[in-house]
Amino acid sequence: MKLNEIRDNEGATKDRMRVGRGIGSGKGKTAGRGVKGQKARTGVAIKGFEGGQMPLHRRLPKRGFNNPGATDLNEVNVGRIQQAVDSGKLDPSAPVTVEALVAAGVVSRVRDGVKILGVGELTASLTFQVARASKSAVAAIEKAGGSVTQSLAATDGAVASA
């Protein structure tokens, strides 16, 4: 016996029932769907319809809103920036800007700017020009001998908000 000769025992598996293949098959004509009505048609389920009962999405109260004026900042940890410096993708002598982070592949598709967060180790002395930085990030950067300049105007084409 070879691998390509392996098969189930005779009668071990039944063929699946193919519906709508003539009345002689026993599952022809209505194909197990009964007679007429919405459930006999294709595309049966109307999403969110609960048979006339008030649907869940209308029973629950409306909450919150999406603020169109909110600043959407990309968050980057100092540990990730240190990785980019160690791998040679980020020049430690040049200031760390949005453009430099995008070029190094640390962030992509920057919206309103970059916020530096303090997770991870930073050993390189870097100068940052970013929209925002957390207190822990500023502490880590200054501990490593670097400096931080924060302003939303320093972002890529974004308008500073008051």
UniProtKB/Swiss-Prot annotation:
Stretches with biased composition (Gly residues): 21-35
Gene3D superfamilies: 3.100.10.10
UniProt-listed PROSITE patterns: RIBOSOMAL_L15
Chain segments carrying region Disordered: 1-42
GO terms assigned for molecular function: rRNA binding; structural constituent of ribosome
Record field: compositional bias (Basic and acidic residues): 1-18
Keyword annotations of the record: Ribonucleoprotein, Ribosomal protein, RNA-binding, rRNA-binding
GO cellular component, one term: cytosolic large ribosomal subunit
Cross-referenced InterPro entries: Ribosomal_uL15, Ribosomal_uL15/eL18, Ribosomal_uL15/eL18_sf, Ribosomal_uL15_bac-type, Ribosomal_uL15_CS
Quaternary structure (record): Part of the 50S ribosomal subunit.
NCBIfam families named among the record's database cross-references: rplO_bact
Protein name listed in UniProt: Large ribosomal subunit protein uL15
Source organism per UniProt: Methylobacterium sp. (strain 4-46)
